[in-house]
């Protein structure tokens, strides 16, 4: 192989997947600083990819154990929006295929918006089934947020295109005739729950951005309904909306004034 430019070396390293590659053996002997920097970057990316693979395998242990028992339709379930002062609580139930793999999958709260959007598209394309449950602020006020979250999860299961054989749920037990395991911080321990958290989060965020367009003075597209200083000041200035949860403090105290 003739001596390549730094740019050519960069393109080659994007193609090379093993140190055994003859081209890599030539590049590693190239003493130019630019090439050595690229080699160092290649090793770091390789190390990161390995860590992501190990993390993914660790997060697949619940699903793999159930598949060993002959189960196929394993639904991960998670919610987003229990804490905000406005907007619905949104849940998702996701059934993934056995060969599903997205490196870097994690709890939706730990991912950037750009990554969540990308993963959302991949999950939608690859999942066996996805169900979403949405419960309004009015119902939350009527039955309380805990019961509303349960209801949204049951709705998400009902909206799946196939019946799950087992449920993996993030920190919740459901009154459903389906075997289930409740996992504390499940969105960081199970790929199915993690996928559900991403579907629920992106779905709810999109709804809150639409509310932001409808009520520009409230900034819903920025705080997603949570009780930030900006949000509380907007309520003081412009009043309580039908999208606000009247049973949540400080909204209920503002109504009493």
Swiss-Prot record:
Q: Which CDD domains match?
A: RNase_HII_bacteria_HII_like
What enzyme category does the UniProt record give? hydrolase
Q: Which GO terms describe its cellular component?
A: cytoplasm; ribonuclease H2 complex
Q: Which residues form the RNase H type-2 domain?
A: 72-257
What EC number(s) is this enzyme filed under? 3.1.26.4
Its predominant location is cytoplasm
UniProt-annotated location(s): Cytoplasm
Q: Which InterPro entries match?
A: RNase_HII, RNase_HII/HIII, RNase_HII/HIII_dom, RNaseH-like_sf, RNaseH_sf
User: What does the record say about how the cofactor binds?
Assistant: Manganese or magnesium. Binds 1 divalent metal ion per monomer in the absence of substrate. May bind a second metal ion after substrate binding.
Role according to the record: Endonuclease that specifically degrades the RNA of RNA-DNA hybrids.
Q: Tell me the NCBIfam families matching this sequence.
A: PRK00015.1-1 (NF000594), PRK00015.1-3 (NF000595)
Spell out the family assignment given in the record's similarity comment. Belongs to the RNase HII family.
* Full protein name: Ribonuclease HII
């Amino acid at each position: 192989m003739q001596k390549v430019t730094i740019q050519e070396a960069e393109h080659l390293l994007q193609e090379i997947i093993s140190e055994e590659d003859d081209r890599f053996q030539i590049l590693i002997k190239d003493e130019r600083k630019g090439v050595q920097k690229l080699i160092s970057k290649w090793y770091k990316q390789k190390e990161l990819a390995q860590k992501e693979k190990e993390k993914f395998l660790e997060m697949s242990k619940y699903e793999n154990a159930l598949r060993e028992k002959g189960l196929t339709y394993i639904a991960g379930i998670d919610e987003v929006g229990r804490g905000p002062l406005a907007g619905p609580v949104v849940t998702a139930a996701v059934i993934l295929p056995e060969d599903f793999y997205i490196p870097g999958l994690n709890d939706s709260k730990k991912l950037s918006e750009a990554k969540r959007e990308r993963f959302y598209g991949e999950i939608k394309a690859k999942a066996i089934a996805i169900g979403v449950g949405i419960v309004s602020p009015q119902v939350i006020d009527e039955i309380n947020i805990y019961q509303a979250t349960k209801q949204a999860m049951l709705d998400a299961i009902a909206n799946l295109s196939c019946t799950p054989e087992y449920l993996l749920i993030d920190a919740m037990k459901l009154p459903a005739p389906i075997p289930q395991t409740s996992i504390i911080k499940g969105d960081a321990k199970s790929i199915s729950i993690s996928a559900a958290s991403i579907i629920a989060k992106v779905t709810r965020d999109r709804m809150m951005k639409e509310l932001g367009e409808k009520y520009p003075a409230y900034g819903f597209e920025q705080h997603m309904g949570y009780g930030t200083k900006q949000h509380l000041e907007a309520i003081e200035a412009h009043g309580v909306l039908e999208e606000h949860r009247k049973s949540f403090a400080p909204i209920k105290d503002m109504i009493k004034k």
